[in-house]
Amino acid sequence: MSTQPLLQTTPGKRIALPVRVEPKVFFANERTFLSWLSFAVVLGGLSVGLLNFGDRIGKISAGLFTIVAIGTMGYALGIYHWRASAIRRRGSGPYDDRLGPTILCFVLLAAIITNFVLRMLF
């Protein structure tokens, strides 16, 4: 039995071994995508309810919420594809995005404030 290592290299030379990406990483990306889509569907349902049963102000608010829901869907799709390609390329990360959810929260807050202001004025 030899005591020599299986792979021998010259000193200072690195061996490139393939790194296996765990399937749970891909599933986590899909789970996050579905969570964003679930939020967008709830927001779209709210806008459809306002559109069907609301007055003129409700229809304006429904339009705003529809725009936010469509923006959320677009954001979710873009981030999903970006993360999936980074995972396939075995990128070192980071895979989080702090700007997108912050912008979506402020846009949603603006839509809610617009709804309240229109209700108070008219």
Curated annotation (Swiss-Prot):
Signal peptide location: none
Keyword tags: Cell cycle, Chaperone, Membrane, Transmembrane, Transmembrane helix, Vacuole
Molecular functions per Gene Ontology: GTPase regulator activity
Residues in compartment: Vacuolar: 54-59
Source organism superkingdom: Eukaryota
Primary localisation category: membrane
GO annotations of cellular component type: cell division site; endoplasmic reticulum; fungal-type vacuole membrane; vacuolar transporter chaperone complex
Membrane topology: Multi-pass membrane protein
Listed transmembrane segments: 33-53, 60-80, 102-122
Cytoplasmic side: 1-32, 81-101
InterPro entries recorded: DUF202, VTC_Complex_Subunit
Gene knockout outcome: Defects in endocytosis.
Subcellular localization(s) per the UniProt record: Vacuole membrane
Any single GO BP term: polyphosphate import into vacuole
Family, similarity comment: Belongs to the VTC1 family.
Quaternary data: The VTC core complex is an integral membrane heterooligomer composed of at least the catalytic subunit vtc4 and the accessory subunits vtc1 and vtc2. vtc1 is a small membrane protein without hydrophilic domain. Vtc2 and vtc4 are related and have 2 hydrophilic domains that face the cytosol, an N-terminal SPX domain and the central core domain. The central core in vtc4 is the catalytic domain. Vtc1 interacts with GTP-bound Ras-like cdc42, which is subsequently inactivated.
Stated role: Accessory subunit of the vacuolar transporter chaperone (VTC) complex. The VTC complex acts as a vacuolar polyphosphate polymerase that catalyzes the synthesis of inorganic polyphosphate (polyP) via transfer of phosphate from ATP to a growing polyP chain, releasing ADP. VTC exposes its catalytic domain vtc4 to the cytosol, where the growing polyP chain winds through a tunnel-shaped pocket, integrating cytoplasmic polymer synthesis with polyP membrane translocation.
Name of the protein described by the UniProt record: Vacuolar transporter chaperone complex subunit 1
Native source organism of the sequence: Schizosaccharomyces pombe (strain 972 / ATCC 24843) (Fission yeast)
Organism taxonomic ancestry: Eukaryota, Fungi, Dikarya, Ascomycota, Taphrinomycotina
